[in-house]
Amino acid sequence: MYSKEMLQGILLSLGRHNLVIYVNENAKLGYSVKFYLDIRGEEEFLESIQRTLLQYSVLSSIVSSGNRPTLRITGIKNLVIISALLPDLPSYRNDVQEFKDIVAIFVVKRHKTLEGLEELMKIKGVL
């Protein structure tokens, strides 16, 4: 188990958010959006992070893809909790504010509108 400060450090240094925008003909706009946070590492390390996240009611899963397992945090409720845990400090990739902006868009469900989708594309660097 890790302390809150250690968990924040792990999230700042190893956490990498992924925003996937893909064509979905069944969606209202013709596109769907997936957003999740990944942490890569050794399985024992990821399991200890997973146990620590459970203290904050954050559900996650360990996905075995590639050469190292990945701890994946999905679901807007879980990502909102993670966003609240993250301090307003610069991260290694300077993407904390970007993560918080994306979470804010999902919270108010703007990702389901054309304007929100355009905002997400700008954040992602597509537009």
Q: PLM features: residue spans?
A:
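Internal intein/HINT superfamily modules and their associated LAGLIDADG
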Residues: 1-127
